[in-house]
Each structure stands twice: as structure tokens, then as C-alpha cells.
Amino acid sequence: MIIKDQAALLAPVERDLRLDLFRGIGLWMIFLDHIPQDVVAWLTLRNYGFSDAAEFFVFISGYLVGWIYGPVVAGGWFLAALKRLWRRAAEMYVAHIMLFLLFTAQIARTARRFDNPMYEHEFNVFNFLSHPDELIGQAILLKYKPVNLDVLPLYITLVLAAPFIVWCLVRRPNLTLAASALLYMLSRRFDWNIASYPPGTTWYFNPFCWQLMFVFAAWCGVGQIDKIRKWVWSRTTMTVAVAWLVFAFVIVMTWHVHALEALIPKWMIKAIYPIDKTDLDMLRFTHFLALAIWVTHFVPRKWKALHTVWLRPVILCGQHSLPIFCLGVFLSFSAHWILTQYTKGVWEQLAVSFAGIIIMIGAAWLLDRAERVPSLFVKVTEVEEPDVAIESAPAPAAALAPASR
């Protein structure tokens, strides 16, 4: 019986390329959104609705955690799941610290080279360069973060909690989701958040609120979505979803065309604002759900285009989300200082934007090729104990995808 259970746990997990596709698209959007006043950024989601790539990444991460580790925990291998998820959290922590050091060095070097201290202030590294002895400790504690480095601490927190979330979802899925919703409401009501640096500030992504998206996604991943599938894709639900998407589009257009704001009743403006990203405003949450309903309707799992050469570049980026995200942070700042120091013309904006995406694709291709090269240090004989064997199961590499502001 143990051998049978172990074999079931080690069975290959069929990859859903849609998740890689949307993560890849999200990585491109993050890169473009981080370039101030970039004309190409008008292609990104945040300009046409309440949600953006952040919701996509957190949902995909939570869904994969539930989908991959739900059967593992249900099979009695909780410690194996905990070990792998905590190891992944440690990898992300190391990646965050390395990204922090290199990104800060890039900003400092650029500021010195062009004698332009604006970069140090704009990206919140001036205090670090002035007092590195104090702020390096704050950075290690995930309190001090330069601009655009807020997301990995959120993921680290969620992944550390993921084994216990999955354990609860496997046993009491609806009760766990209800507890998550209660924590979300209490956090918003009493302003619960994690302290940041300088004193008096808090995390840009409030984990007590963003956990709702993660837990809901994991709830779907452990199989609960199948119980409401008919309701989710009913005509009524899809009609409400498209109406909500249209409403969000109209509201967001008032941000870009101020003349349209006069068409929105004052009581409605008072009711919906502010649309808070830090605490995951419910308008953002529901907008993402409405979008997800229609996207999954038009892009089924067996969509043939997922296997075409045209979508291969963006899928490759999605399959290597952590390193590509880190690379995108450097590239977006590089594009920013190029446009700031030299020119902000439309053609130059197009050039740096597409050059950055091409570099991201190239890096993803190299990472993919590197994974296909046989290791020079393969153990010829290896007898795996059950818990070690679980470690050899398909890794949730996609379960940890970064997002952005």
C-alpha cells in the first residue's frame, strides 16, 4: 500500500502551459510598467482595469501550490511538502538579498556616473548609501526595500505559510477559505500589516490581505473549483463578469481622460475610492476573478496555440519566472536611465522596451538549454527513502512567481 501511494505521489504532473503563458506575459508587463513614462507600457493590464500582474502571479502561485502539494499532503507526506516549500522560500530569500545588493549597486553607480542623485532618491536607496551599516540589517530583516523590490518578501511569507495552508485545505477547505476571508477583513479593519523601514511605514504588499488571493487560488488548486465549475461558467456569472470588466474599464479611463470623470456620479466615486493595492482592495480582487473567468473560457487547457513557436518565447519566460523577474528589475532601471539621460522620444522608448524583452527571452532560452544539459555529478547508484523520493517529485517551480508594484 505504501509503495502504491508513493508511486501515485511520484506520478508526473501534466504541465498547464497556460500558467506559464500568463506568467510570461506578466513578467513582460512588470518590466514595462517599471519604466516610467514608457509608451509601450500602455499595452499592460493596469491601464484598462483595476488589477494588474500582481494578482496574476499570486493567484498562479497559490493555485500551483494547492494543485501540486494537495495530493502530497493528503497522502501523508506533509513534512516532505514543508521541506520543499521552505527550501524554495530560502532560495527566494537569497535571491532577494542578492537582487537588493546588485540593484542598489547599479543605482549608486548610475547616480555617480551621471552625477545625478535623483536616482538614489527616486528608488529609495539614498539612506542606504548614507548609512549602510544600519540599513543592511534592515534589508536582511526584509524591512528596508528599494522601489520595485517589494514583491519577493510577500512571496517568501506566503510560501513559508503554504504547507500549513495546504494541510488545512485538504482537511477543511471551505472553513480554511472562510478563515482566510476573516483574516482579510480584520486586517483591513484594524490596519494589520508588517512593520517596514523607516519606522512608521509598512510593507507595500500587505501579506495579511494578499493571503486571501493565495488561499483562494490554493482552494481552487486542491480541487474545490470543480464543485462550482457549472456555476462559474454559467451564463449569468459570465454576464456579470463582462459587465464588471466594462465598468472597470470605464473607471480607469477617467484616470487618463479627465473629462470622462464628470460622467461618474459623486456617490460612486466616494464609494469606490481609494482602490488600494497594498491591502488588495476587493475591486481589484473581483476584477481579476472576472478576467480569469473569461480568459479560461477563451483559452482552454488544450489550446493548440500553446504549442506553437509564436508563444514559445513568452512561455519560456514564464517557466523561469524568478530569474527573469530579477533580470527584468535591472533591465527596467537601465531603460529608465537611458531614456532619462539621453532622450525620451517614442522611437527610443520602443527600442529600449523591445530590447529588454528580447534580452529576457534570450536569458529564458539559455536557462532552458542549461536544464537540458546532463549533469556531470550524477549519482550512479541511489536508494531513496520515501521522504527523499518525494523530494524527487515534480518541483513546483511555477509555484513561486514574482510580481510587482
Please report, for each region that a protein language model flagged, where it lies by residue.
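Alpha-helical transmembrane segments and their immediate juxtamembrane cytosolic regions
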Residues: 1-405
